[in-house]
């Protein structure tokens, strides 16, 4: 609890400080610090039914909902060379992307799809030849639908073997050029969103959470989370035994982490905040770094929380070379005085017994303290492991309506100013955390270009580049944030006050 109160003090120091006005430049970051941007396969590639690719969980869920889909998306499958040129223009060190399991091994196991294999080899070679480091995510909510149909996907222990075999193919075929691997993207959100809330693939849940067609919110998130941890450990072990000596890469695991702070300075809210941290972060980081689940979860969830055998605990502990942090905003946490009933089928939030209240910067205000809170918490609670910020950004609305044809907002680029302010503030916040001892080694903007967003379709965009999704050629155009990021990565000092924003707009006014 003392740590939470200390983090609350950080919040008080920075929450009302306004925009980050410190002057800093790229040279202030440690040698080897990586700046990049990211995408994911289903959101960027398109070509959903081309060259042997078969449906994944994403395809199934998105086609069942009226919010668009990734059938074409950004058409990165055909336009990757043009996109790499844009990365060079933006001065990126690295590009984070995911491999589509259903493109590489369409049936989940068995023969490798040679056309899919060649696509990823071509993409990686294009990146490397232009001096851009590939950072690969193996799993972004998208195992082949065939495995879900056959045995229930991550609800079944069989998934561990199939995922390890798939990862082995990736290491064997791409590992000579890939040094940073993330096994699972946002494991906590995949487990909660897909098996408690039903909002993300595979869309499973039960009352009292929601009323999906199938699922059990009281137990499935924990089964899935457990199997994800065992699969990660299996993949990490495979890499270290077969490939690490030759390839020299690192294996990480990513989580969505909010900047949690107590709503008040009361002990009850501080305790609730620690409980929320245990459920959201400790659920995965404690096994990865210490070998077992938080005591808070074991006491509350009881027999519904799977148990690691002694051998499994040893395998999971220390299997993570770095922690991938996906962070967007903060949330205040309030203790629930009248505890909900845990009888029947309680969902994830009933177990946690907290109220997140209103996210303090849900509208993505410039509050870099939220990032600092996250990094300080990881440093203090988990032994300061190496960290990469794998996603962090602010969205802009890019379409006036969803539909066909869609009408793009003509003022989108000019409306990117709040996003520039956000990036400036958060990148500066990372620097403050590094100076305070955090072992943070990289920052990836989400996303390199506007993508198909699972919860927002094509209505919102996180990209440095806008994409005209009503254009068959999917024309890309830089936003003001792309120019700012490029200037920063070229070594220009970052300073944003009202005059600095005017100068930035004036500098690139002819480009819009």
Swiss-Prot record:
Residues at the catalytic site: 186 (proton donor), 391 (nucleophile)
Reaction it catalyzes: Hydrolysis of terminal, non-reducing beta-D-glucosyl residues with release of beta-D-glucose
GO molecular function, one term: beta-glucosidase activity
Keyword tags: Disulfide bond, Glycoprotein, Glycosidase, Hydrolase, Signal
Claim: Repeat is one of the keywords in the record: no
Signal peptide feature range: 1-17
Origin: domain of life: Eukaryota
Cysteine disulfide links: 205-212
EC number(s) reported in the record: 3.2.1.21
InterPro entries: Glyco_hydro_1, Glyco_hydro_1_N_CS, Glycoside_hydrolase_SF
Glycosylation sites: 211, 216, 436, 468
Classification via PANTHER family: BETA-GLUCOSIDASE 1-RELATED (PTHR10353:SF150), GLYCOSYL HYDROLASE (PTHR10353)
Protein family per UniProt: Belongs to the glycosyl hydrolase 1 family.
Protein name (record): Beta-glucosidase 4
Organism: Arabidopsis thaliana
């Amino acid at each position: 609890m003392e740590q939470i109160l200390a983090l609350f003090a950080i919040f008080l120091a920075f929450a009302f400080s306004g925009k980050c006005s410190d002057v800093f430049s790229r040279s202030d970051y440690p040698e080897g610090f990586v700046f990049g941007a990211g995408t994911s396969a289903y959101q960027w590639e398109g070509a959903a039914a081309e060259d042997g690719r078969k449906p994944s969980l994403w395809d199934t869920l998105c086609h069942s909902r009226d919010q668009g889909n990734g059938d074409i998306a950004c058409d990165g499958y055909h336009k990757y060379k043009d996109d790499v040129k844009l990365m060079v223009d933006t001065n990126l060190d690295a590009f984070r992307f995911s491999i589509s399991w259903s493109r590489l091994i369409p049936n989940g196991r068995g023969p490798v799809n040679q056309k899919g294999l060649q696509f990823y080899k071509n993409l990686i070679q294009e990146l490397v030849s232009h001096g851009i480091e590939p950072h690969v995510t193996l799993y972004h909510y998208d195992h082949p639908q065939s495995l879900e149909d056959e045995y229930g996907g991550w609800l079944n222990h069989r998934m561990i073997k199939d995922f390890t075999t798939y990862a082995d193919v990736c290491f064997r075929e791409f590992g000579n050029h890939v040094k940073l691997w993330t096994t699972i993207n946002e494991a906590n959100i995949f487990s909660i969103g897909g098996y408690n809330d039903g909002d993300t693939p595979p869309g499973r849940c039960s009352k009292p959470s929601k009323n999906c067609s199938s699922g059990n919110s009281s137990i499935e998130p924990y089964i899935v989370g457990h199997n994800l941890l065992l699969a990660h450990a299996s993949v990490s072990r495979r890499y270290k035994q077969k490939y690490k000596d030759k390839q020299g890469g690192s294996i990480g695991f990513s989580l969505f982490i909010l900047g949690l702070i107590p709503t008040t300075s009361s002990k009850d809210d501080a305790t609730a905040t620690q409980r929320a941290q245990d459920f959201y972060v400790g659920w995965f980081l404690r096994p990865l770094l210490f070998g077992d689940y938080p005591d808070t979860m074991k006491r509350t969830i009881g027999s519904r929380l799977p148990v690691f055998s002694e051998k499994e605990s040893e395998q999971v502990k220390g299997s993570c070379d770095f922690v991938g942090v996906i962070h967007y905003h903060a949330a205040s946490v309030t203790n629930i005085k009248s505890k909900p009933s845990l009888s029947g089928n309680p969902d994830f939030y009933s177990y946690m017994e907290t109220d997140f209240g209103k996210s303090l910067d849900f509208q993505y205000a410039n509050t870099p303290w939220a990032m600092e809170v996250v990094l300080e918490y990881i440093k203090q609670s988990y032994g300061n492991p190496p960290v990469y910020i794998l996603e962090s950004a602010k969205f802009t609305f890019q379409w006036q309506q969803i539909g066909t044809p869609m009408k793009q907002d003509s003022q989108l680029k000019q409306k990117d100013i709040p996003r520039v302010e956000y990036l400036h503030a958060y990148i500066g916040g990372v620097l403050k955390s590094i100076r305070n001892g955090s072992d943070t080694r990289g920052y990836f903007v989400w996303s390199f270009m506007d993508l198909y967003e699972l919860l927002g379709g094509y209505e919102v965009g996180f990209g440095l580049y806008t994409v005209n999704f009503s254009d068959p050629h999917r024309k890309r155009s830089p936003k003001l944030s792309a120019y700012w990021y490029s200037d920063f990565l070229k070594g220009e000092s970052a300073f944003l006050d009202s005059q600095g924003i005017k100068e930035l707009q004036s500098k690139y006014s002819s480009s819009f």
